[in-house]
Swiss-Prot record:
Family statement: Belongs to the ABC transporter superfamily. Phosphate importer (TC 3.A.1.7) family.
Domain ABC transporter as annotated: residue spans: 21-262
Subcellular location: Cell membrane
A molecular function (GO) term: ATPase-coupled phosphate ion transmembrane transporter activity
Binding of ATP, residues: G53, P54, S55, G56, S57, G58, K59, S60
Species the sequence originates in: Streptococcus pneumoniae (strain ATCC BAA-255 / R6)
Gene: pstB2
Functional summary from the UniProt entry: Part of the ABC transporter complex PstSACB involved in phosphate import. Responsible for energy coupling to the transport system.
Record-given protein name: Phosphate import ATP-binding protein PstB 2
Catalytic activity: phosphate(out) + ATP + H2O = ADP + 2 phosphate(in) + H(+)
InterPro entries noted in UniProt: AAA+_ATPase, ABC_transporter-like_ATP-bd, ABC_transporter-like_CS, P-loop_NTPase, PstB-like
GO cellular component, one term: plasma membrane
Length: 267
């Protein structure tokens, strides 16, 4: 078994004007257990960043902290700064629901509402008081086009979303998330329940989406990280070990631990 120096790290940083989101000294605790150990990380605007690492490394916990999804867990506590547009969104006075309009999330398994395809998109807007049908129609079409789903469902908008395939349901969930025009889209293993063809379609959708959004994705699939991301961060035991351009991580990692992990020789 290889012995690694876990105190040795290599973390990429960006000029401030390119940063869409950043964290400073973020820790996450579940009760007395420290799951995330003081992570400093910056995410470049309009790029795709992949978070990789073994199961239990903390990458999903860290991702969920970025728009305070960990708030839903009673024993979870998040400390440190999560900076979006110069504002620490981890402060207690922040309106979490408003913040999530700017930092949206797509979950591991597709979770469409048991409503029509159309109302999956419009539901949040209707609750916010949007009543003009033309406006709602435009939101639906724009969002579905951005999620590369419009051509497949435009004649079936009033059918149940539950009739869609798994890949289509996941792209509908993406359309629903981006319909409120977030700046940042968090994706927690969005392809884990999809077949290879649907996964490829999802990755193609991500490439298009990054023109308008900053995407941060957790994946266990090394090939997906290598194919679909601009930057990759390697997590281990709640810490960020190496963060660099994806090509560097997979072809010329600075640290032996990272190189061993992405090449399948870790341990």
């Amino acid at each position: 078994m290889s012995t690694y120096n876990w105190d040795e790290k290599h973390i990429l940083t960006f000029p401030e004007e390119k940063v869409a989101l950043s964290t400073k000294d973020v820790h996450v605790y579940y009760g007395k257990n420290e799951s995330i150990k003081g992570i400093d990380m910056q995410f470049e605007r309009n790029k795709i960043t992949a978070l990789i690492g073994p199961s239990g490394s903390g990458k999903s916990t860290y991702l969920r902290s970025l728009n305070r999804m960990n708030d839903t867990i009673d024993i979870a506590k998040v400390t440190g700064q999560i900076l979006y547009r110069g504002i620490d969104v981890n402060r207690p006075e922040i309106n979490v629901y408003e913040m999530r309009k700017h930092i949206g999330m797509v979950f591991q398994r597709p979770n469409p509402f048991a409503k029509s395809i159309y109302r999956n998109i419009t539901f949040a807007h209707e609750r916010a008081g949007v009543k003009d049908k033309q406006v709602l129609d435009e939101i639906v079409e724009t969002s579905l086009r951005q999620a590369a789903l419009w051509d497949q469902v435009k004649d079936d908008l009033h059918k149940s979303a539950l009739t869609l395939s798994g890949g289509q349901q996941q792209r509908l969930c993406i359309a629903r998330a981006i319909s409120v025009k977030p700046d940042i889209l968090l994706m927690d293993e969005p392809a884990s329940a999809l077949d290879p063809i649907a996964t490829m379609q999802l990755e193609e959708t991500m490439f298009e989406l990054k023109k308008d959004f900053t995407i941060i994705i957790v994946t266990h699939n090394m090939q997906q990280a290598a194919r679909a991301s601009d930057y990759t961060g390697f997590f281990y035991l709640g810490d960020l070990i190496e963060y660099d351009k994806t090509a560097t991580i997979f072809q010329n990692a600075k640290l032996q631990s990272t190189n061993d992990y992405v090449s399948g020789h870790f341990g």
